[in-house]
């Protein structure tokens, strides 16, 4: 009897401390830009799923992509990045956005993103949603930096533990010296963000692209 009681006690303890993982996916018009402070990998972007811990808060940045209009008036609408923060769940979750059929609807979505998080069985999960405001010449390249600043601000959908997240291929601003690549880390200098970003993306490009850009720059002096 004592042995049985010990076994039952251990089983109860293990059950009470166990964590369960659910899969998170999105509606077809959403793409992941960041997951829990990290850039969404290309392979993950195609699969559009990742695993979450049901005991933790999770945060994703998504963007809505939709072909709007009809016939010769069709165009691609890309929303501003949207932050979604939610509690993990043992059941699979789906992050969804409504279908956008015209640019007016797209503008309304940008002003007030309508994004929901539900379990596969249809139960709504509480989520905090906010727009990730961005500036600069190439805002899409600064998602992680902007997200880290957002998380440090204490805003509505922020998660403080992700505030210190750094970009794997980060842009380091050098106080002096010419822009150069150093062991995979791009080092730039400049008087403003736009100049720094130009230097960063120039160094990311291949030689042919760099040459074409330089020729273009010369022709626009």
Curated annotation (Swiss-Prot):
The keyword Cytoplasm does not apply. Keywords: Signal. Pfam families: DUF2057. InterPro entries: UPF0319 (IPR018635). Residues 1-21 form the signal peptide. Belongs to the UPF0319 family. This is UPF0319 protein HI_1681. It comes from Haemophilus influenzae (strain ATCC 51907 / DSM 11121 / KW20 / Rd).
């Amino acid at each position: 009897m004592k042995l049985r009681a010990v076994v039952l006690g251990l089983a109860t303890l293990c059950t009470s401390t166990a964590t369960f993982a659910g899969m998170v996916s999105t509606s077809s018009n959403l793409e992941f830009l960041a997951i829990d402070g990290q850039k969404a990998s290309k392979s993950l972007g195609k699969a559009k799923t990742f695993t979450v811990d049901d005991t933790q808060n999770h945060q994703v940045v998504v963007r809505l992509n939709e072909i709007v209009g009809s016939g010769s008036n069709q165009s691609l609408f890309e929303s501003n990045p949207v932050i979604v923060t939610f509690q993990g769940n043992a059941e699979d979750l789906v992050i969804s956005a409504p279908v956008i059929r015209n640019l007016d609807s797209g503008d309304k979505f940008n002003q007030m993103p309508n994004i929901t998080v539900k379990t596969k069985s249809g139960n709504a999960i509480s989520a905090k949603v906010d727009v990730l405001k961005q500036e600069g010449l190439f805002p899409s390249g600064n998602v992680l930096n902007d997200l880290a600043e957002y998380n440090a601000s204490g805003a509505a959908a922020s998660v403080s533990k992700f505030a210190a997240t750094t970009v794997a291929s980060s842009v380091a601003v050098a106080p002096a010296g010419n822009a150069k690549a150093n062991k995979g880390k791009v080092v730039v200098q400049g008087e403003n963000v736009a100049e720094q970003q130009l230097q960063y993306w120039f160094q990311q490009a291949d030689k042919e692209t760099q040459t074409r850009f330089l020729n273009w720059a010369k022709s626009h002096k």
